[in-house]
Every structure is written in structure tokens, then in C-alpha cells.
Amino acid sequence: MPPQLHNGLDFSAKVIQGSLDSLPQAVRKFVEGNAQLCQPEYIHICDGSEEEYGQLLAHMQEEGVIRKLKKYDNCWLALTDPRDVARIESKTVIITQEQRDTVPIPKTGLSQLGRWMSEEDFEKAFNARFPGCMKGRTMYVIPFSMGPLGSPLAKIGIELTDSPYVVASMRIMTRMGISVLEALGDGEFIKCLHSVGCPLPLKKPLVNNWACNPELTLIAHLPDRREIISFGSGYGGNSLLGKKCFALRIASRLAKEEGWLAEHMLILGITNPEGKKKYLAAAFPSACGKTNLAMMNPSLPGWKVECVGDDIAWMKFDAQGNLRAINPENGFFGVAPGTSVKTNPNAIKTIQKNTIFTNVAETSDGGVYWEGIDEPLAPGVTITSWKNKEWRPQDAEPCAHPNSRFCTPASQCPIIDPAWESPEGVPIEGIIFGGRRPEGVPLVYEALSWQHGVFVGAAMRSEATAAAEHKGKIIMHDPFAMRPFFGYNFGKYLAHWLSMAHRPAAKLPKIFHVNWFRKDKDGKFLWPGFGENSRVLEWMFGRIEGEDSAKLTPIGYIPKENALNLKGLGGVNVEELFGISKEFWEKEVEEIDRYLEDQVNTDLPYEIERELRALKQRISQM
């Protein structure tokens, strides 16, 4: 392992804000050890103040890292090096003594459920990257809380970074600053170390003034040491270490040890016309509409949806047996393309101020632009693409990167739930799994039991563009929408979910599966989606209340005739939308069987195997 971070205080960095003396002892040791290793010129201990934020933005503007968007209030645009635009699964690793602690050993080929790296290989990689990596730069010390400060479900981290973009983004995405250090005291924290990997003076010029080191990028998680170590990328998912690295990969491992769940799920509150409210959590793969569902304007009169979170849920059963959930984040880091007044009016309202945009296009009047924004341009207004080139609608290339983002405070969302920062969390009564399935999978079905529901999560598949070929679409396995984010062996993760059924007094939520994306033979969507999805939530609400509105099918319960409220909705072919074809499902079950047998292999819990066999049996009798 890399030398335990470190003793001896031979570093010359000058502390330009805050004081090392004021830090809790363990934090101070962490800062000093890494200052000695990375050799920054300055150390800045972040206080999280408005003033500090303003100074960071001004500094980045001066350096040409961001520019001000004059059309909005305190909004900024960053354009990255085109080689640093997304999470990189091939360079994201988990280090444990045994490979099997991280991933099941697959029958053939490589695991698709995570990447393990040995301690020896990591030590070499670490020592080839970090010594001196912050020369000439400032090391920022970011104390942050995932979850409302003081919540029993919250966890604290300290991130050291040489990127002011990371500091500014972390101030939006987490609770950050002095109050966190006060709450931490001598408590435990997750150690996060991040460097863009560009010591000064530069060896080669930056692209777009964006510091990164793509050749040496590595994002490493050391769950046994409660550490995250990231090098070479400034992009959100790789550098905002509170997000996927901590809130999913490290937290899922903590959750297994401590008896809770850390999941890639939105959390929403839905209130019926009588004023009765329920909370639901939903797991969809990235870019399948989590943010749109979490911020939905229901088309059904009298129904109301409110947003607790759009991406991550930390959930734990309380003493009364209610599954309580918090959103560990403080902001939304949303995909911009496709966001419009039609698809997500509440997101559009949220991002009008105090927002950092990354890799979207800019209009000549100081606004933002992207594919699917659906906004008419004023006469004479031109567009500059994310590659900083003039762009015209007829151009073949998109104006915004497909993974371009907005980073915006959750508190600005017009429909943020009144309990979104409740320290004890909100009670979850339904869990929804879903993906993008053009054929075969009905609009909604309900699992037969908790065990069957866990199987449904394990069997999740979703259409993804085959990035390698740029040809057709392929259906990818994405169990629990967690495939890129598991912090430990997926077989053990399934066993952990199954174990929730044995908690004393646990009120297990109902589990549902949805598919907004089924198409007819001409390739047209069978369901209008967006605000109309409230009709599906209404049916779930009734089911949770014990309504007799479902009929049994081989794959689960679907709405009875006329149980789904389609009032005012013309032209929906219900038969096609809910059709369950024996031929399709025989193939589907074979595919799931092959995947679980190959990928989870001997770590597959018996209960999941039993659910698979039972489903096979039911389909064969259709």
C-alpha cells in the first residue's frame, strides 16, 4: 500500500486561509502527510462562505477556466479538455486484499460488475503519480458532509484537491465548510485525495485552460482504509469525490457493514388529491429519466410530486420498522441535453441562478444551449459549441457534449420537498426499478414478494448506445442501476438486500418495475411519458394502500382492466403496452440466467436462483 500518510512535517506549503492548528488532529495529520507528498505551494482550508465562493469564481475566471453567463444570475460555464468529459469505468478501481471481496469471480472472461486492483499494483500506480503532483498549486482542504449535518444517517469526508473547480462544485453538491469541522470533532471521516495531475510549470499547454492528465487518470477506492484517491481527471464523477465514489461505492460497503442501503435512486414525495402523501425511491440507469421523474409536474389533476433527491438514496430501517431515506447530496449534477421546459420545467427553473454548467454550448447573448433545449433563439443570436467553435443547427456534431452537466443547488428547485433535509429521513413505501426497454417489457408490474423484487432489481437491463461501434443500440445489464457503482461483491450485495426481509418489524416497501420506453412496430413510443407517468404512480399509490387493482401474470402483478387512469389520454394502445409475449420472456429469462450464472457465478444467493427457476416455470406454462 502507499506509505501510510505520513509523519515528519517537511513540507514548505504556506497556509493562506484557515490554520492547521484549528483542525481536528486526524484531519491535520491527513493534510500534512499529503502536503508533504504532493508538495503544493499553498494550503487553503475551505470555510464554505459566500465570500470564499466568490473569490474562487473570480480566480477561475481570471485563469480562463470558467466564464460568466451574463443572461443569468451568478451562472458560469466551464469547457473541459475534450479528453476529460465523463466517468471512466476502465480507470475506476477498488482495492481489497482478495479480488472476491470486490467482484464475484466470473465463469469466463472479465467481471462486468466492477474492477479490482491488487494492493501491490495500486502502490506502484500511486507512487508513479502523487509525489510532487501539486507543485506550484494550491491544496484546498474541503470538509464536507454527505447528508444533512447532524443527521444520524449523514457521513463526513475531507477532500484534498488542487482544483478550484472541484471546490466550487463541492460547495453546491455537499454541505461544506467550517460547520462540518465543528460537527466532526474527533469523529471518523472518509479521506479523499484528488489531483488533476498537472504540477507547475506545465510540461505541455492545457486545452481550454482545463488541467487534467488523461494518460495517467486513475480513480481508486480503498474501502478497508476508508479512502478515495483520484488522479488525472477534473470531471465531476471522477473529482467530486462525495458523489459516486463516496455516496455509492464506499457507502455501499459501509451500508453492508452497518445494516443499511446506499443506492443509485431518486427519492420523491407524491400527494393525492385528498392530501395523503407517500415517498417512493426509484433506480434507473443514468440517462433514463431519474431527474425528470423526481421533478415531475403530474398531468393528473390534484396530484402533487415533490423532490427529495434525483440521484442517490441512503436508506435505513428505523426502530418502528420504517425504511427511512435521506438524499446525501445538496445539489443536482444533471445531464443537460434533453432538459427543456417540456421535459422538465422544474429543472429549468432550478438552473436560472447560482449554477455551474460544464460542456454545454453558449449563445452570443450569454445564455446556454444544448440538444433538446427547445428554446427559440432571438434573431441574430449565434451559438458557440462546447468545443469553442461557431455552431449552426445544420452541423453534424452536437453543440453540447452528450454528457454535459449543470451543477445547481437543490434548495432552488421549486418543488423541493419540505422534508428534504429532515435528519431522520423520509419513510419509503415503494421502490421502483426501471430501464429503457423498446420491446417486451410492460409499462409497469409489481413484484410478487420482497425476494422476487430483489430478483427484478438483479435482472434489470436497459438500452444503451454501443459506444464502441456507434452502430445500433444494445440492451445492457445494469442490476439495481448500480453496475458501475458497486463497492463490493454483487453476490454479497444481493444477500444484503435479501437480509432486509429478516429485520425485526421491518415494513418492507412494495417493489415495482417500470418501462416508459416501449415502442410499437414502427418505432414510436407507446406511452407519452413525462407528466403522464403520474398515472402509473397513482396506480402504485393505490397498491401500497391495499387496493385490489392488480391481476396476476407470470412476471408479476399488472393493473386490472381500467385500473390505470387514462382519462383525457387519447390513443394509448393498452394491449400492446401491457402485452406479455411467451417467446420474448423465454429469451429474456435465458439471457438473465446466462448473465447471473456467468457474472455472479458461485456467489449468487440461492433465493435469487429460486426466483429465476420459478419465473422460468411460470413462463413455460403460458
Curated annotation (Swiss-Prot):
Family of the protein in this entry: Belongs to the phosphoenolpyruvate carboxykinase [GTP] family.
Phosphoserine: modified positions: 19, 90, 118, 286
A Pfam family of this chain: PEPCK_GTP
Alphabetical GO biological process terms: cellular hyperosmotic salinity response; cellular hypotonic salinity response; cellular response to cAMP; cellular response to fructose stimulus; cellular response to glucagon stimulus; cellular response to glucose stimulus; cellular response to hypoxia; cellular response to insulin stimulus
Residues modified as N6-acetyllysine: 70-71, 91, 473, 521, 524
Stated name of the protein: Phosphoenolpyruvate carboxykinase, cytosolic [GTP]
Induction details: Expression is repressed by ATF3. Expression is regulated by glucocortinoids and insulin. Up-regulated in CD8(+) memory T-cells.
PANTHER family: PHOSPHOENOLPYRUVATE CARBOXYKINASE, PHOSPHOENOLPYRUVATE CARBOXYKINASE, CYTOSOLIC [GTP]
Chain segments carrying region Omega-loop: 457-487
Gene Ontology molecular function, alphabetical: carboxylic acid binding; GDP binding; GTP binding; magnesium ion binding; manganese ion binding; phosphoenolpyruvate carboxykinase (GTP) activity; phosphoenolpyruvate carboxykinase activity; protein serine kinase activity (using GTP as donor)
Swiss-Prot/TrEMBL catalytic activity: oxaloacetate + GTP = phosphoenolpyruvate + GDP + CO2; L-seryl-[protein] + GTP = O-phospho-L-seryl-[protein] + GDP + H(+)
Subunit structure: Monomer.
UniProt EC number: 4.1.1.32, 2.7.11.-
Residues where substrate binds: 87, 235-237, 286, 403-405
Deleted gene: phenotype: Mice do not survive beyond 2 to 3 days after birth.
Pathway listed: Carbohydrate biosynthesis; gluconeogenesis
Activity control, per UniProt: Phosphoenolpyruvate carboxykinase activity is regulated by acetylation and glucose levels. The anaplerotic conversion of phosphoenolpyruvate to oxaloacetate is improved by PCK1 acetylation on Lys-91 (K91ac), Lys-473 (K473ac) and Lys-521 (K521ac). High glucose concentrations favor PCK1 anaplerotic activity by triggering acetylation on Lys-91 (K91ac). At low glucose levels, SIRT1-mediated deacetylation of Lys-91 promotes the cataplerotic conversion of oxaloacetate to phosphoenolpyruvate.
